[in-house]
Amino acid sequence: MPEPVAEPALNGLRLNLRIVSIVMFNFASYLTIGLPLAVLPGYVHDVMGFSAFWAGLVISLQYFATLLSRPHAGRYADSLGPKKIVVFGLCGCFLSGLGYLTAGLTASLPVISLLLLCLGRVILGIGQSFAGTGSTLWGVGVVGSLHIGRVISWNGIVTYGAMAMGAPLGVVFYHWGGLQALALIIMGVALVAILLAIPRPTVKASKGKPLPFRAVLGRVWLYGMALALASAGFGVIATFITLFYDAKGWDGAAFALTLFSCAFVGTRLLFPNGINRIGGLNVAMICFSVEIIGLLLVGVATMPWMAKIGVLLAGAGFSLVFPALGVVAVKAVPQQNQGAALATYTVFMDLSLGVTGPLAGLVMSWAGVPVIYLAAAGLVAIALLLTWRLKKRPPEHVPEAASSS
């Protein structure tokens, strides 16, 4: 974790602009993720002629690389400072575009081209974990740890915005100039972000002996488990709401996803100070309650409007879960370990989203589509009980190094 600046007397627009000036680098990294997302599966399957397995693997490699590299990103951010980690991550995004470019240029050699695509995806996954973790910690170092919840919230907003913007733009660029043109756009986005990041003032890395990974994990795993359980609701909506609407014979699945995204982003914008005012655990419990109601409404929906209200509530409920629990998790460790704590905490969400799809698919094939939303509501209820227990337990002693944050 970077050494914090003196807690700045910032509020409102000025504070948000300071935060956005840093998290825009995470926006750039996620834009390089979103741009090829809707293009690569079809390119691998239809143009290169590989099976659906390989098309899926090309996409999944990025997520596996992100998952495996995220703890290292946190540790390096603690020891080297977050700015260096962000620049490193953006360089990975640039190299991923270079991988796509060379894959397009070697299209006459399908196996070589596929290997270059896979290499680009792995590098992108590593770059995303470094840029995402680093930008959060850099933002906290700039505006002060009092505003850590707001920094995490803004990081989520720019992530959603970049993914939503990137996918359709990527299709446009691909139809305009093929994979090579798309690759050049990705490289250009990353290069501009790197050039903007390099002149920015550096936030000093923390000085102090870091805790072993096992000790960090021991302090944050309960918060991570609550996050993982709550993420199941997001996972089943994002993955299976289209199948749910098809099974019911309804139209409007895409609009339901739009409602979820609007509720997610809108809640973060409407309640930027909620975590500071009533505490992270209290916010998390309120969010879990709203998410449970939403998932139950989807599961028992007999008309489209019920499902849409349920999806809206689920999006609003899930919106502040990550920052609310994240604020408490990172403050459970000394300052010099808070980067590692944030990265370790985030891994639980990565794992949850990775296993929710296959497990929900098995349940769905056995008991029907609506059941997965009822099951997800049950998991979020467990997260609510776990958070209630965390609130009731005596506060743990955190070493003095963490007291300033």
Curated annotation (Swiss-Prot):
It is found in: Cell inner membrane. Disruption phenotype: Deletion increases intracellular arabinose concentrations as compared to the wild type. It holds the Pfam family MFS_1. Induction: Induced by arabinose. GO terms for cellular component: plasma membrane. Keywords: Cell inner membrane, Cell membrane, Membrane, Transmembrane, Transmembrane helix, Transport. It is a multi-pass membrane protein. The chain crosses the membrane at residues 19-39, 47-67, 85-105, 107-127, 156-176, 178-198, 224-244, 252-272, 283-303, 309-329, 344-364, 366-386. Residues 40-46, 106, 177, 245-251, 304-308, 365 are periplasmic. Residues 1-18, 68-84, 128-155, 199-223, 273-282, 330-343, 387-405 are cytoplasmic. Signal peptide: none annotated. NCBIfam families: PRK05122.1. Belongs to the major facilitator superfamily. YhhS family. Confers high-level resistance to glyphosate when overexpressed. Overexpression has no effect on intracellular arabinose concentrations. This is Uncharacterized MFS-type transporter YhhS.
